[in-house]
């Protein structure tokens, strides 16, 4: 899916404490992972109120593969998120990325990031997201996925959801949150934030954060780290001092190859260590 949202990039969300930075695409750095040896396609995921679209990838064959839920940035399940799914499949996972604000609107219809946030993202309730991720996990379990070895990872908007879903689903063995919001003013749609749930995590979460993030302060990261330690959690937070928000997004100028590679290696080790691989 080639979406018009790839014509611009966002350094962070304007809502919930995220600073916004619009920059041009940096296509020359974008990583492309082929689908050789994989089963990979767009899908429809049955939900309690119908269905939502998504994308999945897994190794070809009839084995059962550890499931990883891949949670989108604000731009939805665009080519970068699909590529991340294929990267996981090359490692032996069944990776699935549901479109988590499909009901609120198609973000590819908007050219301006303010419209994406104001008309779509800000209207997505956390309860809906949790149900849809449950549905994605159930779908994966019927399609060669091993949900007893299930991990979750997400980026930016999806980083916050990674913390929440790890607290929501007792089947999650481990999570990796890439620069997700940790604190914020609660409201009807978002009644809790990750820092409120440190004592409810069903599996350990590895947080990967940026020292030069203009939307997530180091003070916020430090408060989260302190809360985790106070609760005796084995979750960890790693800060890349010289990186910006979006350092894993290889199609943006914010991409930091060294930090992204290190984070990806740490993710794999984290999943292996905690039973999600």
What are these regions (language model features)?
Residues 1-16:
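N-terminal secretory signal peptides and thylakoid transit peptides that target proteins
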Residues 29-60:
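N-terminal cap/lid segment of alpha/beta-hydrolase-fold proteins
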Residues 65-73:
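Short beta-strand element of the alpha/beta-hydrolase
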Residues 79-98, 102-103:
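Short amphipathic alpha-helix adjacent to the substrate-entry channel of hydrolases
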Residues 111-151, 276:
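Gly/Ser-rich "nucleophile elbow"/oxyanion-hole loop immediately N-terminal to the catalytic nucleophile
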Residues 138-194:
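Primarily recognizes the serine-hydrolase "nucleophile elbow" in alpha/beta-hydrolase
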Residues 185-231, 236:
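The feature captures the conserved acid-bearing segment of alpha/beta-hydrolase catalytic domains
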Residues 234-277:
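C-terminal catalytic histidine-bearing segment of alpha/beta-hydrolase fold enzymes
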């Amino acid at each position: 899916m080639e979406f018009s949202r790839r014509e611009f990039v966002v350094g962070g969300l304007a809502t919930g404490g995220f600073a916004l930075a619009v920059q041009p695409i940096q296509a020359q750095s974008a990583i492309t992972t082929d689908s050789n040896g994989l089963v990979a396609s767009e899908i429809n995921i049955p939900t309690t109120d119908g269905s939502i679209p998504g994308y999945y990838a897994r190794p070809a064959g009839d084995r059962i593969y550890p499931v990883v839920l891949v949670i989108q940035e604000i731009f939805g399940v665009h080519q970068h998120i699909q590529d991340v799914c294929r990267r996981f499949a090359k490692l032996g996972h069944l990776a699935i990325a549901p479109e988590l604000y499909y009901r609120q609107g198609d973000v590819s219809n908007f050219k301006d990031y303010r419209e994406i946030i104001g008309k779509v993202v800000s209207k997505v309730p956390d309860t809906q997201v949790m149900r849809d991720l449950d549905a994605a996990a159930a779908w994966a379990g019927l399609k060669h996925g091993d949900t007893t070895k299930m991990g979750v990872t997400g980026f930016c908007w999806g980083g916050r959801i990674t913390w929440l879903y790890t607290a929501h689903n007792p089947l999650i063995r481990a999570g990796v949150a890439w620069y997700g919001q940790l604190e914020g003013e609660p409201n009807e749609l978002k009644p809790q934030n990750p820092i409120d749930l440190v004592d409810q995590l069903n599996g350990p979460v590895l947080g990967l954060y940026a020292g030069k993030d203009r939307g997530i302060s180091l003070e916020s990261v430090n408060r989260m780290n302190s809360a985790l330690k106070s609760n005796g959690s084995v979750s960890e937070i790693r800060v890349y001092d010289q990186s910006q928000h979006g350092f894993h997004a290889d199609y943006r100028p914010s991409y930091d190859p060294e930090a992204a590679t290190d984070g990806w290696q740490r993710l794999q080790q984290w999943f292996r260590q905690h039973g999600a691989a």
